[in-house]
Regions:
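Two-component system phosphorelay core
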Residues: 1-65, 69-76, 80-128
Length: 128
């Protein structure tokens, strides 16, 4: 009598607010817009790594600051869902509740990869 294990593929698709990118493109031009998006994606990637390190080290104060920075950076390039989840994580960290913090942090990490990929693909394709 063995237990059956089911693997649940938890994947979330990123939603991209293309109007933010269009405003950037109109104000900066194609080339500079792409550079800005690449720079923001680099910073988001870096901060996601720092956030994971802070969470693994039980450093809630640093993790909260990083989550808030992730939220504001991601909004600049149209990643509203990612920003909302990052703000949710900051709120969980501020409340000091470990269970929702773990769940929301895992969701942010899942959403992060697809979000960053989506914004880069859109920025490259729309420049054509």
């Amino acid at each position: 009598m063995g237990a059956e294990l089911y693997r649940i593929g938890a994947q979330e698709e990123a939603e991209l607010d293309t109007s933010r990118l269009l405003v950037l493109r109109q104000s900066l031009g194609d080339e500079r817009c792409r550079e800005v998006v690449e720079e923001v994606v680099f910073h988001l990637t870096d901060r996601l790594g720092q956030l994971q390190t802070a969470l693994d080290g039980d450093n809630a104060a640093d993790a909260q600051v990083l989550a808030e920075r992730l939220a504001s950076l991601s909004e600049q390039v149209g990643l509203a869902d990612f920003a909302r989840v990052a703000r949710d994580l900051a709120a969980c960290l501020a409340a000091g509740d470990a269970t929702p913090t773990s769940a929301v942090a895992a969701r942010l990490m899942r959403l992060g990869e697809d979000s960053l990929f989506s914004v880069m693909v859109y920025a490259d394709q729309s420049a054509l």
